Structures are given as C-alpha cells and as structure tokens.
Amino acid sequence: MEEITFEKAMERLEEIVDLMNQPSTSLDASLKFYEEADALMRICESRIRKAEERVRELSEKRNEDFLSEEESFVH
C-alpha cells in the first residue's frame, strides 16, 4: 500500500465501514474490504505508536531541561 496519511487512512476506514454495512455488499466484497481495512488499521496503529514515542521523547527532554535549569539555580 502506498504512503498514506493517518487522516486519509481513517477516512478510508470510515468509507469501508459504510460499504460493509450496505446489504447489497457481497461476501467476497466484504472480505476484500476487511483485508483493506486491516492494512489501514496497521498503518494507523503504527503512526499512533510513532507519535506517542515522539511525545514521550519531547516530554523527557523537557523534564531533563527543567532539571538542568533547576540545578543551575541551586548551585
């Protein structure tokens, strides 16, 4: 699957849910939609994990900077 933004992946997932909820959607089509949705969910989960990791890194850096500044005031 080509590079896709988190937002586009979520948008496509919503479309797939709508399509799968239609009574006219065949079993074969539903299976293909499910496979596509699975790939999209993996992309979204990966992006969320990366974002969480980055936030954690930034928070740790901010805490380190704060402690460093605090030590300089004490000495």
Swiss-Prot record:
It is found in: Cytoplasm. One of its GO terms (molecular function) is exodeoxyribonuclease VII activity. The keyword Nuclease applies. It catalyses: Exonucleolytic cleavage in either 5'- to 3'- or 3'- to 5'-direction to yield nucleoside 5'-phosphates. Coiled coil: none annotated. SUPFAM superfamilies: XseB-like. It comes from the Bacteria. This is Exodeoxyribonuclease 7 small subunit. It comes from Chlamydia abortus (strain DSM 27085 / S26/3). The lineage of its organism: Bacteria, Pseudomonadati, Chlamydiota, Chlamydiia, Chlamydiales.
